[in-house]
């Protein structure tokens, strides 16, 4: 079994044990996609690579794409189909996003929170580019190497043990107790005044962002981080290399945006000639 297949199966255990619907709020969805907005999506063909249980697609349909397709290697596609039941012009496809090649490229291709879990994140990015039509937009989000020292040195070693255990053990005996201190830390950061001293604390911006959510979401995020067999923390320099080394990309349109102090949003357009 390939490592990406193991990862897909691990995440299916995560996604398939959530309540029906999207685990994300409207504000979280819009934050992940900025600088893209509804006007960029409306009436366009849109592809999500690594759709999980369809949590992002549930929000994406509200932006009224002409056609929306999600691809995922795991059995979470079953839950995605349930969450998207009754929506018109929506399709969920079970397949390897790295190998996926659409007969017709899409106007918009996005990959949120998936590339960093692949055996080869760069090959995943190549699929994003390959499936975007000339003049179309691509948009990705990945964990950053920058700003994640606490995660890399404390959480990631735990992941190497937890990821080989049964999902329920990882969720309830690892993710739950591990996330309690960070839950309290994030809620405290939200209450404290926004002064320069506190802004130097670990994961400060991320703590303020996630503090808007309930404990169950904290645990979902922790479980996601612990259940996967592999996680890469990608430096900005690597993303710059991905973007600048591909002649298909219109270099005048590219962007790399730090999100919450510990992740990167990046994207651009495919050149028309």
Predicted regions, residues:
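Conserved N-terminal segment of class I S-adenosyl-L-methionine
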Residues: 1-47, 51-104, 108, 232, ...
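Short conserved AdoMet
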Residues: 85, 119, 133
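A short SAM/SAH-binding and catalytic strip from SAM-dependent methyltransferases
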Residues: 108-119
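A short glycine-rich, Lys/Arg-flanked "PGG" loop and its adjoining helix->strand segment in the class I
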Residues: 122-134
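Conserved class I S-adenosyl-L-methionine
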Residues: 139-170, 176, 180
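Substrate-binding/catalytic lobe of Class I Rossmann-like enzymes that use SAM or dcSAM, i.e.
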Residues: 165-244, 248
